[in-house]
A protein has these predicted regions:
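Beta-propeller folds
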Residues: 1-316, 321-325, 331-332, 353, ...
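Serine-hydrolase catalytic core recognition
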Residues: 108, 169, 175, 298, ...
Length: 607
């Protein structure tokens, strides 16, 4: 198992804390540093560091049946950004609030590992769109053990999406999101009796995007992120839920609440200006919670983020990159000397790789769409070049940014091999705010297709582009949209790669899919028309479909079913399945995929 060890920062004094066959997961120190809580065998435990004594706080944990203190798959993926832990210490370290999941209603997806002599079967509880979700509740238990107080959150088929203790530790704040994701309540629940009452509520006609930008101040007031005016801003509420005054300025959208001062006088956020191409960058800003003052701490172009902010001193770790420079980090003491941290950036500065250009192009209905262009190395305007187009295309997504990515490095490799590389974000992307995202409600594909066709029109206007040699590719939702594009506009792109695509939206998980498409029984036409598998007989272009056989997010069932339909239609295509690989490839499989993608585009587009 994975036992826990404790090492003193003052010296090499490694101490083993647990001796168990089962692994300890999601360990977290109590606020006073005297205990560690963790999950073992789907139950919640507390270990006293002074005595070494363990206390088991729950007893009914069982795989695929009951989970305590840990997220089930769909909550971890869609609500908590793949965070495993599902428990929260009280401020005084005396109690723990935790999730309890009843997974018995949830259907099972079976993943098969064919690599051993006898294949290994893994059963995954995975609620597909329209199917039963896990039943979740929040309990509060004393660290000494004893009876759990269950919070009366009501509405069992809703999502209990965020859990936070009040500063005094006498209550727990729970964000309850309706299953259709149109209504969000912030509940205040007594930690002793479990009685809940609403502090505030929000409603939106399509769906509400959950944020991680709720934070209590020491005096009980709280910060709350909302897109009520079409862009995400922070609002300051009284402890009773009244008020709700904006503290971040109009014309800026907040993407993260990074930290709050110990005395509640300021907050640090990551944000971008909403006008024009402002969203390509990310700025770190400090907002005064006394005067609503707004100070940009990172005015330079690029993608900036803040981490490890000291609530006492205001010191923080600043990380920065741009489209052509890998991330650099530095410690920024409040008023002190900058401390640079190690970076790989100087190596790439000397590599003379092709540089990205960020621009706008004409879009549907007179709009301007954000785009990125990478010209081939040794660019000659009298030559005609093939173009690889990379996209994602989902609601609120963003590909066109001024930030480094590993995938961008492969695009630069392709530019060195004679390709131009291009991306365009459509009218439902992050650049157009919540009202833009809403264009995808109950129907995927059409908005992105219009954006990609606008991109093709722009490329055709460039005299050095050979529009007969256009390639399209994407991963996950981008793989789905790649299929949708080539199947609905055959002949526009000569070759395409669809990586880990959803091919039938009935096969994807409940939280993500229902947010945008509603339930299948309420929107059968939308599911049919949004699913690439509906159009398989239309395939005319060269297609490579790629999927990991251990993908527990977008199941290989999607690509297997697509392959079957393409075979029935008598349509030629290529496919590559990767044993043991999940939704993102690692190790030799990642290298193999990029080598395969390079070979595919060079063969089909012949620079």
């Amino acid at each position: 198992g994975g036992d826990l060890y404790l090492e003193s920062l003052a010296g090499h004094n490694l101490r083993r804390l647990t001796h168990s066959e089962a692994a300890e997961e999601a360990p977290h120190f109590s606020p006073d540093g005297r205990r560690i809580a963790f999950v073992r065998g789907f139950d919640l435990y507390v270990l006293d560091l002074a005595s070494g004594a363990e206390t088991r706080l729950t007893t009914d944990g069982q795989e695929n049946v009951a989970l305590n203190g840990t997220n089930d798959w769909v909550y971890g993926e869609e609500i908590w950004n793949r965070q495993p832990e599902g428990f929260w210490w009280s401020p005084d370290s005396s109690r723990i609030a935790f999730y309890h999941f009843d997974e018995t209603p949830v259907g099972v997806y079976t993943l098969l590992d064919d690599t051993p002599l006898y294949p290994k079967v893994t059963s995954q509880k995975y609620p597909k769109s329209g199917e039963p979700n896990p039943l979740v509740k929040v309990g509060v238990v004393d660290v000494a053990g004893g009876k759990t107080a269950w919070l009366g959150t009501g509405e069992p088929d809703s999502y209990l999406a965020r859990v936070d203790w009040t500063p005094k530790g006498d209550a727990v704040a729970v964000q309850r999101l309706s299953r259709d994701q149109k209504h969000l309540d912030l509940l205040r629940c007594g930690a002793n009796d479990g009685t809940c009452s609403p502090l505030l509520s929000e409603t939106w006609h399509t769906w509400i995007n959950l944020g991680q930008d709720f934070r209590f101040l020491p005096d009980g007031r709280f910060l709350w992120g909302s897109e009520r005016d079409g862009w995400r801003r922070l609002y300051l509420y009284g402890a009773d839920g009244r008020g709700g005054q904006p503290v971040t300025p109009e014309g800026w959208a907040v993407t993260a609440l990074d930290g709050v001062a110990a005395d509640g006088s300021w907050a640090v956020v990551t944000a971008f200006p909403t006008a024009g191409l402002g969203a390509v960058d990310r700025k770190v800003a400090r907002v005064s919670l006394k005067s609503a003052g707004w100070e940009i701490l990172t005015p330079e172009p690029g993608s900036h983020s803040a981490a490890a902010i000291s609530p006492q001193t205001g010191a923080w770790v600043h990380t920065w990159s741009d489209a052509d420079t890998p991330a650099r980090s530095e410690v920024r003491p409040d008023g002190g000397k900058l401390i640079a941290l190690p970076s790989a950036a100087p190596t790439f500065d000397a590599a003379s790789l092709p540089k990205w250009e960020i621009l706008t192009i004409p879009g549907p209905d007179g709009s301007r769409l954000p785009a990125r262009l990478l010209k081939p190395a040794g660019f000659d305007p009298s030559h005609r070049y093939p173009v690889i187009i990379y996209h994602y295309g989902g609601p609120g997504s963003q590909v066109v940014d001024n930030a480094w990515s590993v995938r961008s490095l492969w695009h630069k490799l392709m530019a060195q091999r004679g390709f131009a590389v291009f991306s365009v974000d459509n009218q439902s992307s992050l650049f157009f705010g919540k009202h833009g995202e809403d264009k995808d409600y109950r129907r995927f594909g059409t908005v992105n297709l219009a954006g990609q066709l606008a991109g093709v029109d722009y490329l055709k206007s460039l005299p050095w582009v050979d529009a007969s040699r256009l390639g399209l590719w994407g991963w996950s939702g981008g793989g789905s949209n790649t299929l949708y594009c080539v199947l609905n506009r055959p002949g526009v792109w000569k070759a395409a790669i669809a990586g880990a695509p959803v091919t039938d939206w009935r096969l994807y998980d409940s939280i993500w899919t229902e947010r945008y498409l509603d339930r299948p029984e309420n929107n059968a036409d939308g599911y049919r028309d949004s699913s690439p598998i509906t159009y398989t007989a239309n395939l005319k272009d060269h297609l490579l479909v790629v999927h990991g056989l251990a993908d527990d997010n977008v199941h290989p069932q999607n690509s297997i079913n697509l392959s079957g339909d393409l075979i029935k239609a008598g349509v030629p295509f290529e496919q590559a399945f990767y044993p043991g690989q999940k939704h993102g490839f690692r190790g030799p499989s990642s290298r193999h995929f990029y080598e395969r993608a390079t070979e595919f585009f060079e063969r089909e587009l012949a620079p």
